[in-house]
Amino acid sequence: MIWRLNVRLSCLLACWLPLAAHAVDVEPGKDPVPSVMWAFYHKQFLAEAPFVFDERVKLLTPPFAEDARQVPLEIDARAFKGHVLKILAWAELNPLPKIVDFQPKAGVLPWLSLRIRIEQATPLRAAVLTDDGLWHVGSTLIDAAGGGCTAPSVVRTQPGWEEHIGEVLGGRYPRGEFSRVRVQVAHPMDNGMVSGIPEFYLNHAQLRGQDGQVLAELELFPAVSENPNLAFDIDAPGPTRLVLRDNSGNEFDAAIP
C-alpha cells in the first residue's frame, strides 16, 4: 500500500512540477499600455496567476469612442485555437470594469464581438487562459469624451419597450471554413448607475448546437451596451440556439438556422 501511494505521489509530482516551473519562470514582458490599475486587476480578476502580455491576443476597437454608450469591441484569440479555456475582458477605468467572461468550447473559435459602454478614456484588456495554466493578456487604449456608463437609457424612451424584451434578431453567415453568428438582443442592460433605475441586465448566455451540446458560455456584465450585439465564429455544423438569462431570472431562447 505504501509503495502504491509513493508511486501515485511520484506521478502527481512529475505532472505538476513542469507546470510549476513554467509558472515561476515566465517573463510577463512590458505592459504595452502602462496603467496604474494593472496590478489591482491582476490580483482582482486573475488571482495573481502567471501571465504574459501577448500581442497575439488582439483587441480591435476605434481609437476614439464617438458614442461612449455603444463602443464596438472585437476580441481575437484565434492564435490559440484549441487551447483556450476562457477569455476575460474589462475596461480598467470604468466604474463597472468587467465586460465578459467567455468560455468557447469545441465548435466555437476563440473570437467574440460585442458593444460596450465606457465612462472615460481607458485601457481595455482581454486575458486568455490557455490549457497550460498561463494567462495571455491583450491590451489597447481607447479615448472618449465620456459618460457612457451614466447616460440615461435610450431603450426606456421607446414606447412599449417592455413588450420586446428578449427578442433576438440576427442570423448565421458563411465565412469560408466557418460561419459567423451575429445577433442583437432587445434588453435595456440597466447598470444601476442612473438614478431610480436598479440593475437589470442579461448576465448569462449559452450557445448550443443542434443536439443540445453547449458550444460556448458567456457571463455578461453591466458594461455591455443596451440591446446587446454579439457575434461568434462557429465551425460546428447544423443550426444553433442562443439561450439567455437576465439577473431578474427571465429566460429567453432563440433558434439560429
Spans of model-derived segments:
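Short beta-strand edge segments in extracellular beta-sheet folds
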Residues: 141-147, 257
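Short acidic/polar inter-strand loop motif in beta-rich domains
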Residues: 131-137, 246-254
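Structural beta-strand segments of beta-rich domains
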Residues: 69-73, 177-181
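Surface-exposed, short loops/turns at beta-strand junctions within beta-sandwich domains
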Residues: 115-121, 233-238
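Aromatic sugar-binding surface patches on proteins
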Residues: 105-112, 222-233
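Low-complexity, Pro/Ser/Thr- and charge-rich linker/hinge segments at domain boundaries
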Residues: 28-34, 145-170, 176-178
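Short amphipathic, basic-aromatic surface patches that mediate peripheral association
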Residues: 184-196
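N-terminal edge beta-strand
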Residues: 41-66, 158-174
